[in-house]
Amino acid sequence: MEMQWRRLRERLASEQCQDDSVEIDKNECQFFYRLWRCLNDPHAGQADRLHGYYDALQCAHAHGLLPLRLPLKELISTPELARAGLCRNRDYPGEILLDEKALQIAPDLLSVWRNDKRRMLQAPPLDNLLPTLLHDVKYTHYTSVGQQLAVRTVLTSQKDRFLFINLPTGAGKTFIIHSLMLAASPGQLTLVIVPTISLAIEQAHRAQEVFQQAGVDHGGEYAWHSGQSAEERNALKERIKAGEQRLLFCSPEAASSGSLLLLLFSLAKRKLIEALVVDEAHLIDQWGAEFRPEFQLLAPLVKSLVEVAQASIRTVLLSATWSQSTLNTLKELFAGDCPQAIVEVNGSFLRPEPMWYVHKAKDKNDYQLQVEAAIQTLPRPLILYVTTVEDALSWHQYLRTSGYQRSGLIHGKTSPKQRAKQIADWADDNLDIMVATSAFGVGMDKNNVRSVLHVAVPENIDRLYQESGRGGRDGFASVAQIIYRPDQIALARRLNRDNLIGAKKGFLRWQKMHLNRESEGKGRFSVYLATKHDSIKIDSRANIAWNWRTLLLLQRAGFLSLHFSAPDLEQFASNQQSEDAVDRYFNHYFSHIQIELHRDGHLDKQVWNGTLRQLRSQELQTRQKGFLVLEEWLNHQDKPLCGMLETFYTLDGYVPELACGGCPGCREKALPPYSPTLGLIAHAISDEEHGRIGRDIRVYYPSARSSALLLRQWNDWIARLLVNRDIHAIRASQTVLAQLSQQLFKGVPFWCALSPEDATTRWDELVIVMPGERLPDLDPFSDIKRIIVAPETLLEQNVRGRLWWESDPRARSLDQFIRSLSSGHHK
């Protein structure tokens, strides 16, 4: 750090300040690096440059670097310097300092400029098979116990499972996707649906780097998006048809487009879809019924693909911020008719990076002054969140006129082209401030955001936490601040109540859709999603969205389930149809939804006024809960936010690991930031049944040969156990695990690598004891199946003179066991 500071001072004092060749190490100090970028950016404004000096000086202040001043040759007035928290040095007029007020800034804020590490995770070693697949020396450990459990659970689960994965930002959800693809059978496609096109492209680039290293990259595109040329799209289609694509990222809109959907149903018919993964899955609930109805198509799409395949498709839903209500909704949407297929993996912990600050303005003038002061002092990069498009435009205009030219703008009406440019500039550190509505930041892999400023009240605590969590993704301290006016509370309350269908209007919509239904056979009928009841005269997306909300309410109440019919693949078999013709077909296809009724009463007004009104009331209370928690915190800041978040994000009784970067309630109690080692606890929850206690199978072998030779001879039967899914884990010494990962043939299913001292897991396991080793201490009350293979002459522990297998009448020799594998009598 001292060398970087000295180098920065020397370059600023030299005549060649505008020099891109000068190395200021971004990884060592992002604040020095940003100042240098600003000074070499012809588009930067004066406020950008001055704040660059401010951040660099605060960083030096936090690290105790001397001299605490920087050369500034530009002639800038004293008032302008003062607005930036700076002043001229009386003894060295060509240099500037932090002014007295800036030096007296809250000490805990210095942790951001000091780059204090806040996130420390327990990182267990990778299972031995994964490094063999990855061929990358930098992958040696999981990021957390939660990631380890998630990868193991996903890769060993049955294909008919719906897996809900809850891992915090930075705990490695993306690695689950890469592992799933690498461990998949040849020819199988893993489809990953992400919220935005830009994220699909970004994730595809990251995946390609992994696959290049693993030696399985086909050299083409891994994302399906509208920006592709006809040549790129055709090549992608051919790889998908040939079973060579293996992994594909797309947005919900792309998954719902005719061209891709046709390919997906064709693959399903050939049983070539390995898994469907939804990243940021909480948005299905939060966005799907509002401005992105395509999210709500994903659940019926999965059901339809499974029907066409007449085989299971593993479905994985990933999120860092599940709330209980969202989790319950998605369980119902995806697995409402088969709850026994649900598997949850919860490796949640509270984010330790954000330091929370709240300021309630007295009036509009005070509000404006407080926001301006925050913009002038908060570390960069900074996201400034608003609620409305109008506010976004207003604050962006303020920044530009104030000299902050390195500021971007993204809201719900931003064009795709402009959005892509803004995101690229943001990712490349060409912007220091991003003004945004809630549509920005989802899944964005920008790790070094240091401040998130809310200048409006979000509609609930969940949104505040999600958006504030876009700071500090690199694990270092960040600032999360909210400045609000009293009148903004009412707007947040109204936003929180929007988009829930009422019983009266819902009944009218359903009555009209049902009246115009068309029979589809097999006990199903279809309804037109743009149906208008008598009070509606104009076609609109809003009308379709409200019809969706009506159908989803009926589904959540158990009256019906939603399905898409399989498209007529024969119609497109000749491959002569143009893409426009395909899209026209699917525009009509997606304007209808198939319905299967499960109970009576759906046309009874009394049922709507009773059962459905009660359900809607319960859902409204659930939705209001998030707002009420936020409102309570804003009104009672003496209550620790960390404790409130711990309660709010408790899922099915499992509490997230506690951490706190600093909140008003903890500061009032003089409590320092609480950043323990996290990622120590994870839970997998399912209805999967194991057999009775005591299912150990003891297998003994003669130990006359070397361990290496024995393992080579055993290769076939061990592989057979894995392929038949008789076991999902192997417990042995590291030497044995390493040799097995190298010698087992490619295509063998993933297996968990357990050392002898590891605790008992949820997976049936093979225990291998080589000559000269002792039996591990195994839990005798575990309900998993264990096949224990050990030398014939090994003595029972704590029982003098008795061989380890003699007390078990079911014990058998290895030769007998291998013969039983063919007959199936080994179980």
Report each predicted region and the residues it spans:
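N-terminal helicase ATP-binding lobe
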Residues: M1-R351, D363-R380, V389, L393-R406, ...
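Generic beta-sheet signal
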Residues: I193, L301, L318, V455, ...
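C-terminal helicase lobe
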Residues: A374-L393, Q397-G412, Q418-S438, M444-I685, ...
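Short acidic low-complexity segments
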Residues: A436-S438, F750-T761
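Long, charge-rich boundary regions
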Residues: L641, P673-L740
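C-terminal EAL-domain catalytic cores of bacterial cyclic di-GMP phosphodiesterases
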Residues: R786, P791, R800-R802
